[in-house]
Swiss-Prot record:
It comes from Influenza A virus (strain A/Hong Kong/156/1997 H5N1 genotype Gs/Gd). Its main location: host cell. The keyword Disulfide bond does not apply. The keyword Phosphoprotein applies. One of its GO terms (molecular function) is RNA binding. Residues 286-483 form the RdRp catalytic domain. This is RNA-directed RNA polymerase catalytic subunit. Residues 53-82 are annotated as: Disordered. Gene3D superfamilies: 6.10.140.720. Phosphorylated by host PRKCA.
Length: 758
């Protein structure tokens, strides 16, 4: 029968239907081609917002730089980046006054972090700008390449493995007159294959040394590479995001550690917590404002939107904030933290891949790299691109755009939140000194503002005062996109509040379904997602049961593992039918082996192997989970794995699921074609690097109280640890005397090899 969809909504309160309007089903839009245009947009817009600032020239790189700080006060509602330093410092002082000891304690915590953080922090993260090759690489590889170049230039402080020592090398590298780097290049030649006697193209990878002058090196060290942000829903236009190189990353990490420590102590901050914890924090602020308003006051909430948050922020303001926050701290600590904002004040934006041209008549395609845009004839470009290039040309140095104002997406989320909260903090009556007062929530660029006042005029005055105060620190609340409502109904970071948070279930839709890792992980992740949504997102029992049935169906179609007694023919059905017939206890077969589904909403927390273990035939158990079976994954069995799930909004979330190693937890092999390209050496480096890190983790698991600090190399640290562990094991009788002697012998051999290697 046909169902009229409007009937579905008859008994549903309007706020619960909000999620159906979200663009979250189906595939998200991806960008194709080059991000160069989007990057030029960002650079040009950022300069436009600060155009009344002062121009200077960087003495080292020759880059023209625009400084809008303490610029003219805005006279209209247009977005602008003219933050006033004294206003920012005053906001910081009031924030500290309302939270005694806030900055002091956070500095102490961060100092400990700075001294203990190891370099492997920088191997996290995916694509990173690799300044040695001038393109993006996985983080671990980019770090390895940087260290290799540092070492060949006599910078070796990083060998201690401490991040702070690596940063000392970075500082020293910037004073060097020149840096020698190794670049990779490809040679192609045609040779005859001995076996087939056909001509084939043989590629050889060459490495060549290249010297960078101080100027060129500094430009690369200060460069952010840009890409297009993918999979953004609900937007017509794509936008550019940036990835910084290894020189900047470590410094940013420490600044964010300090800011995170501050945010954790601020009740108005939506970072760094998430999920239910965040909702609880928000609900508290709302409750406070509503209880205080009671009968005498009105309470209104603005669901806020800021215009181009990043492009109006300024690194110089962050420098002022850090200078104030750390004012009573040791000199070395203040210096380490002030470097990130200084580097960002001098940053350069790499314009991405450039443009692709094709001539229909001659069937020719050619790539114009971004570096050529400075002096190419503009007649080849269309009107809008021509305008962009003309605007950006004065800013280009060695093919890279100088971008002093603005912050680029996601670099200082925590610190910019501190700035936002400091303005919310000024809403207390003791600061407004009038009848209206405000409070609110801030999470990076998203905010909700709650204003209380005796009458509507007071509310209006309060919002106006907030708006103007924000302008003084370079925050531009958008009057077009923000809206105001009686307190009790608002939206903040995609959480919808209506006398309590409404579950926005559509946000979770993209994470339902089969992940495509392997049969074992996919089953586990699928049921965990359903379980988590029953806990956190009002997924009711009937809907959950339906979701489960749909998931199992989807899973069977993905892996072609329909039940052994089904009529559906797939390329696996012959084997699965055979297995079905041979099996005595058919209920014990896993779904991926053609077995029945035993999951229901009551047992989603049990891994499938555990659920069916007692029902399995003995020989099936033996094949499925036998570590000697070559098809059982040989990764160590950790009871919990992490999967990356894609919610519809915000970054990919890490989700824990139970992992049982069976013949179904295979790991797909890398695509072979990479092994024949210039990436091959890089791939091998990456694997070696990964192996070394894993080995180190084995010696110093995170559970051991502290990682070694101040020992001269990873190798020495591991050898000394091995000796200590061996002695403990020997004295407690866990290992025999011969084994103990052998371990000591191996340790000495390793040390000897290490000495020869030096």
């Amino acid at each position: 029968m046909d169902v009229n969809p409007t009937l579905l909504f008859l008994k549903v309160p309007a706020q619960n239907a909000i999620s159906t309007t979200f663009p979250y089903t189906g595939d998200p839009p991806y960008s194709h081609g080059t991000g160069t245009g989007y990057t030029m947009d960002t650079v040009n817009r950022t300069h436009q917002y600060s155009e009344k600032g002062r121009w200077t020239t960087n003495t080292e790189t020759g880059a023209p730089q625009l400084n809008p700080i303490d610029g003219p006060l805005p006279e209209d509602n247009e977005p602008s980046g003219y933050a006033q330093t004294d206003c920012v410092l005053e906001a910081m002082a009031f924030l500290e006054e309302s939270h005694p000891g806030l900055f002091e304690n956070s500095c102490l915590e961060t100092m400990e972090v700075v001294q203990q953080t190891r370099m492997d922090k920088l191997t996290q993260g995916r694509q990173t700008y690799d300044w040695t090759l001038n393109r993006n690489q996985p983080a671990a590889t980019a770090l390895a390449n940087t260290i290799e170049v540092f070492r060949s230039n006599g910078l070796t402080a990083n060998e201690s493995g401490r991040l702070i020592d690596f940063l000392k090398d970075v500082m020293e590298s910037m004073d060097k007159e020149e840096m020698e780097i190794t670049t990779h290049f490809q040679r192609k030649r045609r040779v005859r294959d001995n076996m087939t006697k056909k001509m084939v193209t043989q590629r050889t990878i060459g490495k060549k040394k290249q010297r960078l002058t101080k100027k060129s090196y500094l430009i690369r060290a200060l460069t952010l590479n840009t890409m297009t942000k993918d999979a953004e829903r609900g937007k017509l236009k794509r936008r550019a995001i940036a990835t910084p190189g290894m020189q900047i990353r470590g410094f940013v990490h420490f600044v964010e550690a300090l800011a995170r420590s501050i945010c954790e102590k601020l009740e108005q901050s939506g970072l760094p917590v998430g999920g239910n914890e965040k909702k609880a924090k928000l609900a508290n602020v709302v409750r406070k404002m509503m209880t205080n308003s009671q009968d005498t006051e009105l309470s209104f909430t603005v669901t806020g939107d800021n215009t181009k948050w990043n492009e109006n922020q300024n690194p110089r303001i962050f420098l002022a904030m850090i200078t104030y926050i750390t004012r009573n701290q040791p000199e070395w600590f203040r210096n380490v933290l002030s470097i990130a904002p200084i580097m960002f004040s001098n940053k350069m934006a790499r314009l991405g891949k450039g443009y692709m041209f094709e001539s229909k008549s001659m069937k020719l395609r050619t790539q114009i790299p971004a570096e050529m845009l400075a002096n190419i004839d503009l007649k080849y470009f269309n009107e809008s691109t021509r305008k962009k290039i003309e605007k950006i040309r004065p800013l280009l140095v060695e093919g890279t755009a100088s971008l002093s104002p603005g912050m680029m997406m996601g670099m200082f989320n925590m610190l910019s939140t501190v700035l936002g909260v400091s303005i919310l903090n000024l809403g207390q009556k003791r600061y407004t000194k009038t009848t209206y007062w405000w409070d609110g929530l801030q999470s990076s660029d998203d905010f909700a503002l709650i204003v209380n006042a005796p009458n509507h005029e007071g509310i209006q005055a309060g919002v106006d005062r907030f708006y103007r105060t924000c302008k003084l620190v370079g925050i531009n609340m958008s009057k077009k996109k923000s809206y105001i409502n009686r307190t009790g109904t608002f939206e903040f970071t995609s959480f919808f509040y209506r006398y309590g948070f409404v579950a926005n279930f559509s946000m979770e839709l993209p994470s339902f379904g089969v992940s495509g890792i392997n049969e074992s992980a996919d089953m586990s992740i699928g049921v965990t997602v359903i379980k988590n949504n029953m806990i956190n997102n009002d997924l009711g029992p009937a809907t959950a049961q339906m979701a489960l049935q749909l998931f199992i169906k989807d899973y069977r179609y993905t892996y072609r593992c329909h039940r052994g007694d089904t009529q559906i023919q797939t390329r696996r059905s012959f084997e699965l039918k055979k297995l079905w017939e041979q099996t005595r206890s058919k209920a014990g077969l896993l779904v991926s082996d053609g077995g029945p589904n035993l999951y229901n909403i009551r047992n989603l927390h049990i891994p499938e192997v555990g659920l069916k273990w007692e029902l399995m035939d003995e020989d099936y158990q033996g094949r499925l989970c036998n570590p000697l079976n070559p098809f059982v994954s040989h990764k160590e069995v950790e009871s919990v794995n992490n999967a990356v799930v894609m919610p519809a909004h915000g970054p990919a979330k890490s989700m824990e699921y139970d992992a049982v190693a069976t013949t179904h937890s295979w790991i797909p092999k890398r695509n072979r074609s990479i092994l024949n390209t210039s990436q091959r050496g890089i791939l091998e480096d990456e694997q070696m690097y990964q192996k070394c890190c894993t080995l180190f983790e084995k010696f110093f698991p995170s559970s051991s109280y502290r990682r070694p600090v101040g020992i001269s190399s990873m190798m020495e640290a591991m050898v000394s640890r091995a000796r200590i562990d061996a002695r403990i094991d020997f004295e407690s009788g866990r290992i025999k005397k011969e084994e103990f002697a052998e371990i000591l012998k191996i340790c000495s051999t390793i040390e000897e090899l290490g000495r020869q290697g030096k």
